[in-house]
Amino acid sequence: LKCNKLKPLAYKTCPAGKNLCYKMFMMSNKTVPVKRGCIDVCPKNSLLVKYVCCNTDRCN
């Protein structure tokens, strides 16, 4: 997961209060993200799901 610190037009910015980017993967297939977006607190990994978070609000 690449975190973007600059402001290129291609990257969206997270809404106020949700300034972490994240990707969610299934543990059975860690190469294809199931969901991505913005969140306020990085979720904990579970047996089925792995989360990868960034501490920036530039989503890619």
UniProtKB/Swiss-Prot annotation:
MF annotations from Gene Ontology: toxin activity
Q: Which GO terms describe its cellular component?
A: extracellular region; membrane; other organism cell membrane
Instruction: Kindly list the cysteine pairs connected by disulfide bridges.
Output: 3-21, 14-38, 42-53, 54-59
The record's keywords, sorted A to Z, are: Cardiotoxin, Cytolysis, Disulfide bond, Membrane, Secreted, Target cell membrane, Target membrane, Toxin
Supply the SUPFAM superfamilies for this chain: Snake toxin-like (SSF57302)
- Return any one Pfam family short name: Toxin_cobra-type
Where expressed (tissues)? Expressed by the venom gland.
Output the InterPro entries linked to this UniProt entry.
Cytotoxin_Cobra, Snake_3FTx, Snake_toxin-like_sf, Snake_toxin_con_site, Toxin_cobra-type
Please verify whether the record's keywords include Secreted: yes
Q: How does it assemble?
A: Monomer in solution; Homodimer and oligomer in the presence of negatively charged lipids forming a pore with a size ranging between 20 and 30 Angstroms.
Q: Which family does it belong to?
A: Belongs to the three-finger toxin family. Short-chain subfamily. Type IA cytotoxin sub-subfamily.
Q: What is this protein called?
A: Cytotoxin SP13b
Record the organism: Naja atra
- Origin organism lineage: Eukaryota, Metazoa, Chordata, Craniata, Vertebrata
